[in-house]
Amino acid sequence: MSSEESYRAILRYLTNEREPYAPGTEGNVKRKIRKAAACYVVRGGTLYYQRRQRHRKTFAELEVVLQPERRRDLIEAAHLGPGGTHHTRHQTWHYLSKTYWWRGILKQVKDYIKQCSKCQEKLDRSRPISDVSEMLEELGLDLESGEESNESEDDLSNFTSSPTTASKPAKKKPVSKHELVFVDTKGVVKRSSPKHCQAVLKQLNEQRLSNQFCDVTLLIEGEEYKAHKSVLSANSEYFRDLFIEKGAVSSHEAVVDLSGFCKASFLPLLEFAYTSVLSFDFCSMADVAILARHLFMSEVLEICESVHKLMEEKQLTVYKKGEVQTVASTQDLRVQNGGTAPPVASSEGTTTSLPTELGDCEIVLLVNGELPEAEQNGEVGRQPEPQVSSEAESALSSVGCIADSHPEMESVDLITKNNQTELETSNNRENNTVSNIHPKLSKENVISSSPEDSGMGNDISAEDICAEDIPKHRQKVDQPLKDQENLVASTAKTDFGPDDDTYRSRLRQRSVNEGAYIRLHKGMEKKLQKRKAVPKSAVQQVAQKLVQRGKKMKQPKRDAKENTEEASHKCGECGMVFQRRYALIMHKLKHERARDYKCPLCKKQFQYSASLRAHLIRHTRKDAPSSSSSNSTSNEASGTSSEKGRTKREFICSICGRTLPKLYSLRIHMLKHTGVKPHACQVCGKTFIYKHGLKLHQSLHQSQKQFQCELCVKSFVTKRSLQEHMSIHTGESKYLCSVCGKSFHRGSGLSKHFKKHQPKPEVRGYHCTQCEKSFFEARDLRQHMNKHLGVKPFQCQFCDKCYSWKKDWYSHVKSHSVTEPYRCNICGKEFYEKALFRRHVKKATHGKKGRAKQNLERVCEKCGRKFTQLREYRRHMNNHEGVKPFECLTCGVAWADARSLKRHVRTHTGERPYVCPVCSEAYIDARTLRKHMTKFHRDYVPCKIMLEKDTLQFHNQGTQVAHAVSILTAGMQEQESSGPQELETVVVTGETMEALEAVAATEEYPSVSTLSDQSIMQVVNYVLAQQQGQKLSEVAEAIQTVKVEVAHISGGE
């Protein structure tokens, strides 16, 4: 096989595990493929050749090129040097073989250089001519004529014809060289211009700004912006679907009303579509990302994500105007009332005031955990540091460490961008305070980055340096490691209690001692595992210690059925699955250990003191004035000075000014401003801001419901759903309204209920320009505009159905994921959303039996009669009370409901809209038709008798007009009987005459299907006006007066 085929066979052998060989491959060929594949490796679908480097133990991976066109292009690129020069064969081979490889690469390089005309000319000029014959050929002379010039031509001719020389091939007369250059004018030429794209965009943008060739007008906040449909549809799928649905592709100009869009967030996207440059204020980044997600502009979303990742990876904090500083408070936080912040030592030797939300506190700038020398001596001045080039660099990449030195205890606080690790001794935990910064700090107790460490490797991140330096520094502290273990053991004993198991307590002590619990919850554990391999896990080391002490470790109980690896890492109580056994052990401590820490202000309980402390901070934020005053009095009573207070660090968002307790919280908070949703579902692609929301969403895709109720048959996907369901059985609910005290089984019900107590805005600020609806929020208006524009942006990925509203799309998508739909026990209808099922049960009319099963009957308090429909109940109550608001204008009979009046009017007009499909007999109402079909056509009785929409509208209009005309003719006949010889003059407008003619036309020509509502209302209003005795003087002068004979009108009917 050829080299390309052999390479493809090797690539197939390395990638295709099911069929590594092509069909029909012989056994000897398979052996060769296996042997050759040992020198190759596949990276990202590309085949690489591993070549051993000389005098080294490493291998160089060279990409194998399979395409002949690409091989020639690579040889050409390696052969051509800078400035148009040509490399030699050795140089070309050297440059090319550094990265690429294929069989016969050297031969192809030689062949290419032989075909290169410029290299051949250079070779011909530089080659020395050593042979005489070559010289004669170059000069155009013959060999014989040069040596024997005295011989005549005859002798030459005889010499050439002699038999001795006849056997030798006669040399042709040398001819001077002629180079023939053939220019092929056929073929396809492909060249690309890198400036063409920008030039076209620039021209389109200029046309947009000068309103040239614009075919769409965008209305945003009352202002018009011209644009091109092709540019908008190329950048946004939203506009493309909009123009296709509305038929605006073929029309000359279209006007798009973008109500609900904000001009500040839309104009940057419009500029990006024409300039490919996205420029916006960082404060409005969230609005831009939300709008780009609505318009399906994926490139803008990628830019927003890259900006956020840059801020995450390089530890950037973006501020509009200002610099980042690492500050630490040296005053006790218990004194926090009033005043402005004291001056801060700046780099220029001046003092600046830093406004904070903590009140009066002295701010000291720390660089790598050391105080400036000028401040130690009592002066304020500059503090140069060789490690920090600028303030921004120190805030972005350096690690601020604050350390205290006391004769009794040591405390180290480590602050990084990704996490905040706090290592405290037992005395500090009991007192819940952190010692103040001592003015004289020794260099041994401070973790700082020295020039030697920085010189070892600049690519090491700050997290890795801090994580590796923690155990080294712990050994350098004056207090030995064994004493620290004893102190931690004493605190662990007080935390766990005497009844806890020894194994768990020891495991907990060790994890807290080494900071594993903090790393586990901060996401650092995986990084530490990747960086350095631990020979023994924490469980193995604890087991070894227990065996050495003569104690036997208790083996966890395992079921005989669960022998798989997955079952060994599954919690038996809650069903959670863990990848590591250590995580399962730590998780089981939550179930088996009692919640000893109770909040004195509320009823919540916690397992750890740190959780209780974090919970109490939330209470102190609500009662800040009272707590500060009580803390100040207790501080004076105890005699402690403000210098020995606890150092509190708060992180302030530069955009909204919100204060956050941790740097991690600030990072999560910044997601709201950037609009980036980093957590995406791999199944449906939905994105979330928080990882917890992604986990809850992923549980919806799971078909298995592992949490089952013990009291009933129901099962649930999440544990929270099971707990909410258990509140129905127990009657106890933790979701209580703080305003009215109403309890709810679910948190969603409480959140919906709480909106009733919140004051709604008096004015709906977002109005629809197409209809009269208005909305409180812009997103509701945007979704509402989808119906007017005909856009259906929400598409189902399973069946490609599209919807305008997100709730309709979500209800449809659940039909694919939900295995067991909600089914009505009466009519059998299936619903994939519980809200729709409840609405159906509440409002659907299943007949009397169905309503009785659902306990929705209404009983009359006076006679005890039961009703299944609300309108029947209301009509019955009107009969008891004597209220009959619906009166017939012909005979004056009043009815309790409009349905009875409509049926009665048909007796005057003679209209019978309900026709039997078998015998074609017509009836006034559906009930009479049902009686007829039950008596004579029992096999053809339908479930429900309804008129079609057009037919029903026609009959309703005909009933109104006929009723009005009958009233008119009856009044005319009465006046005729009173005065038969007189003609009555009736004031009729021209429009009314047209309506009456239309009525007559419908009676003469039954093919006419419907009437206009305006004509009907004109006739009805005219008749009512005649009944009420409207005077002629009140009629406007514009009304045309026509004399009409009553006999003529009656004759027309």
Swiss-Prot record:
One of its GO terms (biological process) is regulation of DNA-templated transcription. PROSITE patterns: BTB, ZINC_FINGER_C2H2_1, ZINC_FINGER_C2H2_2. Residues 141-173, 546-566, 619-643 are annotated as: Disordered. GO terms for cellular component: nucleolus; nucleoplasm. GO terms for molecular function: DNA-binding transcription factor activity, RNA polymerase II-specific; RNA polymerase II cis-regulatory region sequence-specific DNA binding; zinc ion binding. CDD domains: BTB_POZ_ZBTB11. A zinc finger (C2H2-type) spans 569-591, 597-619, 651-673, 679-701, 707-729, 735-757, 766-788, 794-816, 822-846, 858-880, 886-908, 914-937. There is a cross-link at residue 1043 (Glycyl lysine isopeptide (Lys-Gly) (interchain with G-Cter in SUMO2)). Residues 157-168, 626-642 have a biased composition (Low complexity). Pfam families: BTB, Integrase_H2C2, zf-C2H2, zf-C2H2_6. The modification Phosphoserine is found at residue 1050. Keywords: Disease variant, DNA-binding, Intellectual disability, Isopeptide bond, Metal-binding, Nucleus, Phosphoprotein, Repeat, Transcription, Transcription regulation, Ubl conjugation, Zinc, Zinc-finger. Residues 141-156 have a biased composition (Acidic residues). Residues 214-282 form the BTB domain. It is found in: Nucleus, Nucleolus. Residues 556-566 have a biased composition (Basic and acidic residues). InterPro entries: BTB/POZ_dom, Integrase_H2C2, SKP1/BTB/POZ_sf, ZBTB11_BTB_POZ, Znf_C2H2_sf, Znf_C2H2_type. May be involved in transcriptional regulation. It is linked to Neurodevelopmental disorder with progressive movement abnormalities, cognitive decline, and brain abnormalities: An autosomal recessive disorder characterized by global developmental delay, developmental regression, variably impaired intellectual development with poor or absent speech, difficulty walking or inability to walk, and various movement abnormalities, including spasticity, hypertonia, dystonia, tremor, and myoclonus. Affected individuals usually show poor overall growth, often with microcephaly, hypotonia, limb contractures, and cataracts. This is Zinc finger and BTB domain-containing protein 11. It comes from Homo sapiens (Human).
